[in-house]
Curated annotation (Swiss-Prot):
GO terms for molecular function: large ribosomal subunit rRNA binding; structural constituent of ribosome. HAMAP family: Ribosomal_uL10. It comes from Symbiobacterium thermophilum (strain DSM 24528 / JCM 14929 / IAM 14863 / T). Belongs to the universal ribosomal protein uL10 family. Forms part of the ribosomal stalk, playing a central role in the interaction of the ribosome with GTP-bound translation factors. This is Large ribosomal subunit protein uL10. SUPFAM superfamilies: Ribosomal protein L10-like.
Amino acid sequence: MRTIRPEKQQAVAELKEALQNAKSVVLADNLGLTVAQVTQLRRELRQAGVELKVAKNTLIGIAARELGIEGLEPYLHGTTTLAFSYEDEAAGAKKIREFFAKEREPKFVMKAGILEGKVIDADGVKALADLPNRETLLAQVLAGIQAPLQGVAGAINGLLASFAYALDARIRQLEGAEA
């Protein structure tokens, strides 16, 4: 195994820390982005809790290997930009896709991703980007739970109302018989 220079060891340590702390990572190939585009992308990603880094493929490979992340090597070619999502798993993929949907020609090609320590291919990253955010998913689950409960409550309410109407009718009938 090759020895790594101290400055490279520091870069590997930073990559390892980011890989460990991130909920997901998107690896992308940025083809000819301007400085203004990169700055704007970084700003938008930062607002979503995503950090954008450019790193050497060999250092990414070393950091991944040391963390036990396997299967990343085939995707480590060209210029690799990493988007580390620290809050929402889908935020990085979603924001990158949204940002480049505005461009006429895509200059950012998603290569792969890392989700829960497992490597996913570009199609997996795109599927991750298509997922609704956490709040929307929770709302959908709660709506799914709430709907049957509302149906049961409505049925019980209907039975009670029918019983009340029948009881009221019987009271009127008895009052009419006494008079």
